[in-house]
C-alpha cells in the first residue's frame, strides 16, 4: 500500500435527481428529506457514504485492503473479531494483562482494521467491540468527511399513487382486483455536497493513501451508476470539483474555496427540470496561491 497523502483537499459534488427520491426520511413516511423552514431538499452524509462504500465494494471486489466494514447483513463484531484474533486475543484472554505486556496492542489492532477496511481508513469508525473490551482503539477519526447535501433550489415533493394487479392474500382476492400503494418523487432537483480530506489525519491515524484517494474520486463519480433503482429515479453526479493544497495543513480556509463555486439557475428558467437549466462556474481569480482547482467531470 502506498504512502499516506501529503496534501489537504476540499471537494464539492453536484448531483441531480429526476423523478425519484434521493434520500427518504423514515420519520416522515419516507418522504424526501426537506428543511421545513426553507423547503430546500437534504441528503444526509450517511446516505452519500453508503453509495461510496457500495461503489468501492463493486470496483475493488476481492482487492486486498479494500474490504468494507459497514455493510448490509454483516455484523460489525464479526470483522472486529478478525483483528482480535490477529493479535492473539480470544474469549479466555486476560486483555488487561496483555495490554500491560504489550503497550502497542491498541495500535496493532487499529492498524489491522485500517489496513484491511477502506471505509475505516477513509471515513473512520466507532468499533464498540473494542471499547467494551477495554481497548483504546475503538474510535478512529477518518481523514475524509462529508456534509449534508442541500438542493440548489427549494424542492416540491410529490406523492404518487400507484396500483398493483397482484393481490397479497386469498381473502383480499375475493373482494378486489388491484392494490394501491404510494411513493414519493421529486420531479427534478440539483444538490450540492461539500467534503474535506485531511492529510494530517491520514498520516497520524489511518494511512489513507494516494491510491485510496484515486479510488475515492472514482467512487464519487460513479456512486449512482451501479446503484440504480426505481425508487431513486435517474440520479447522476454532474460535477466533482477538487481543490488541492500544496501542503499538509492547507493554504487557505475551506469556506473561501467553496465560495468560488457558483451554481445559478438560468434567468429564463422558472422550474428547473434538467442540469442544463443551471450555470456552474468557478471563479478561479479568487483561488489563493498554492491551491489548484480541478473539475474532474
Where are these regions (language model features)?
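RNA-binding basic/glycine-rich loop and surface signature characteristic of RAMP-family CRISPR effectors
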Residues: 1-297
Amino acid at each position: 500500500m502506498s504512502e499516506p497523502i501529503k496534501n489537504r483537499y476540499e471537494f464539492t459534488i453536484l448531483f441531480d435527481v429526476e423523478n425519484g427520491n434521493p434520500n427518504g426520511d423514515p420519520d416522515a413516511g419516507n418522504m424526501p428529506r426537506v428543511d421545513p423552514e426553507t423547503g430546500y431538499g437534504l441528503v444526509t452524509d450517511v446516505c452519500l457514504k453508503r453509495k461510496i462504500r457500495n461503489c468501492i465494494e463493486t470496483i475493488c471486489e476481492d482487492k486486498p485492503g479494500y474490504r468494507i466494514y459497514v455493510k448490509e447483513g454483516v455484523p460489525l463484531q464479526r470483522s472486529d473479531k478478525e483483528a482480535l484474533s490477529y493479535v492473539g486475543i480470544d474469549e479466555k484472554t486476560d486483555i488487561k494483562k496483555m495490554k500491560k505486556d504489550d503497550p502497542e496492542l491498541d495500535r496493532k489492532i487499529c492498524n489491522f482494521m485500517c489496513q484491511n477496511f477502506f471505509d475505516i481508513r477513509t471515513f473512520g469508525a466507532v468499533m464498540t467491540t473494542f471499547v467494551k473490551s477495554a481497548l483504546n482503539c475503538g474510535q478512529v477519526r477518518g481523514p475524509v468527511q462529508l456534509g449534508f447535501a442541500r438542493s440548489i433550489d427549494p424542492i416540491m415533493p410529490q406523492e404518487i399513487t400507484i396500483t398493483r394487479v397482484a393481490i397479497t392474500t386469498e381473502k383480499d382476492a375475493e373482494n378486489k382486483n388491484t392494490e394501491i400503494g404510494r411513493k414519493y418523487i421529486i420531479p427534478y432537483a440539483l444538490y450540492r455536497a461539500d467534503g474535506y480530506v485531511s492529510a494530517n489525519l491520514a498520516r497520524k491515524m489511518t494511512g489513507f493513501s494516494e491510491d485510496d484517494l484515486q479510488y475515492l474520486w472514482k467512487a464519487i463519480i460513479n456512486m449512482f451508476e451501479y446503484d440504480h433503482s426505481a425508487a431513486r429515479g435517474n440520479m447522476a453526479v454532474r460535477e466533482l470539483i477538487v481543490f488541492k493544497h500544496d501542503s499538509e495543513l492547507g493554504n487557505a480556509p475551506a469556506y473561501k474555496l467553496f465560495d468560488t463555486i457558483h451554481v445559478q439557475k438560468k434567468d429564463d428558467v422558472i422550474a428547473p427540470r434538467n442540469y442544463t437549466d443551471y450555470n456552474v462556474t468557478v471563479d478561479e481569480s479568487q483561488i489563493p496561491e498554492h491551491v489548484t482547482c480541478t473539475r474532474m467531470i
